[in-house]
């Protein structure tokens, strides 16, 4: 059966808990992932795992020292539709990929208090959905970018729109998100 805990600390102190999922607002990911690692728990952390490269390095160091599994919850690589797209492209079923357009959008501007709209909680479109446009093309094609050009729009301290055009190993990709 499931056990309920009245705090995150109590959850981490429970010897019957082997792993935790960290779905908190972005700015809390590193803090609670590190606490979970220190408590000897495997960690599945919502994206983005960290807000800064140095924080990510600290997570990697803690993971390496602990021997625990620590992973980012990133749906693209595990989703059957993207696995199939990768298989079809790699096998040549659709011919040579020359251009890819990827877009992801939703409108949450009517919710200014939403954590995705607040800079202090790590909000912004690139951290929330922008990664899916770029990541899906990169995963499906197996191509890495060699040049990028971007346009970005910000409102109230967070990015709400971006369009990135990239050259990816002979292909051209355009990645757009708006939030």
Pin down the residues of each PLM region.
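Short, Asp-centered acidic motifs that coordinate Mg2+ and/or phosphate
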Residues: 18-19, 99, 173
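A short helix->loop->beta-strand "cap" motif at the edges of active sites that frequently abuts
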Residues: 2, 39-41, 66-69, 170-172
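Alpha-helical elements of Rossmann-like donor-binding domains used by nucleotide-donor carbohydrate transfer enzymes
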Residues: 10, 19, 31, 58, ...
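Contiguous beta-strand/loop segments that form the cofactor/metal-binding neighborhood of enzyme cores
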Residues: 134-179
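Short loop/edge segments at beta-strand edges and connector loops
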Residues: 6, 45, 53, 72, ...
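Beta-loop-alpha module in the N-terminal Rossmann-like domain of NAD(P)-dependent dehydrogenases
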Residues: 2-61
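Predominantly a Rossmann-like dinucleotide-binding segment in NAD(P)-dependent oxidoreductases
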Residues: 76-149
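Rossmann-fold dehydrogenase core element
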Residues: 57-75, 96-99
């Amino acid at each position: 059966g499931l056990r309920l805990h009245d705090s995150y600390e109590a959850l981490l102190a429970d010897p019957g808990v082997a792993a935790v999922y960290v779905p908190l607002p972005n700015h809390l990911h590193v803090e609670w992932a590190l606490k979970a690692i220190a408590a000897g728990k495997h960690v599945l952390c919502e994206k983005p795992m960290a807000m800064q490269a140095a924080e990510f390095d600290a997570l990697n160091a803690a993971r390496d020292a602990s021997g625990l599994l620590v992973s980012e919850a990133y749906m693209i690589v595990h989703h059957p539709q993207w696995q199939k797209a990768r298989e079809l492209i790699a096998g040549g079923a659709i011919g040579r990929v020359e251009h890819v357009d990827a877009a992801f959008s939703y409108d949450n501007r009517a919710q200014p208090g939403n954590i995705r709209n607040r800079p202090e909680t790590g909000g912004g479109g690139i951290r929330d959905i922008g990664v899916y446009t770029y990541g899906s093309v990169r995963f499906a094609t197996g191509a890495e970018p060699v040049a990028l050009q971007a346009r970005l729009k910000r409102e109230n301290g967070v990015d709400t729109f971006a369009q990135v055009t990239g050259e990816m190993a002979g292909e051209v990709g355009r990645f757009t998100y708006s939030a």
